[in-house]
Amino acid sequence: MFLIGFRDDIYTKPYKFPEKMELTHASTEYLEPSPVDDIYYLGKKGFEWITDPKKNLRRSRVNQDIIGCETANQQDNWIGDFRVEHPQPWHYNDDRIYIGQFDFNDGNGLVDAVGRKMTPRECMNLMGFDNTFNIVVNDSIAYRHAGNSIVVPVLKALIQSLTEYL
C-alpha cells in the first residue's frame, strides 16, 4: 500500500495513481538457470513441510498457482519462497538433499522430486532488481532485504506519475 499526500493549499488538483500494470512475466523467468548451489535444496523435513497439503492451508498466499509463500513471524520464522522440481542426476548422490514423491499435475502421478528455496538473487529478481544489482550481504540478510524492498517497477511508476503531477 502506498500513501501519497499533498497540502491542499499548494496542490489543488487531485493526484491520480498510475494505472494497474498487466503482469507479463512467468515466474520461471525470475529463476536462476540450473544448477543452483546445493545449499538451497531441502532435506526430508523441509521437503515434507512444503509439500504437505494440510500445512499449505495455513500459509499466506500470493498467487498460489505459481509459488508457495510463507510470511515471517516471531513464532516460526520459517521464511522464503519454495520450488518443487524434478531432480537432476547429481541430487541422487547428495545425502543432504531429500528426494521425495510429488505430483506435478502433468499426468504422470507421483514422481521423484526435490524441494528448494529460492536463492537471494531469485528473490531480488522477483522484486524487480536486475542482475546488475550487487548482493553484498549474507543470504539471511539478503532475504530480509528482498522481503522489505519495494517492487522496483511499482516504485518507477509512482515516481513517474509524481514527476508528471508536480
Question: Where are each of the predicted segments found?
Answer:
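Short, flexible coil/turn micro-motifs enriched in small/turn-prone residues
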Residues: 63, 142-144
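A helicase ATPase "motif cassette" and its flanking acidic/Ser/Thr-rich regulatory loops
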Residues: 151
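Generic alpha-helical structural context detector
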Residues: 68-71, 124-128, 160
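Acidic-aromatic/histidine active-site loop/patch
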Residues: 155
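Short, hydrophobic alpha-helical segments
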Residues: 159-166
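Class I S-adenosyl-L-methionine
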Residues: 1-92
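FAD-binding beta-loop-beta segment adjacent to the flavin cofactor pocket
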Residues: 95-106, 110-137, 142
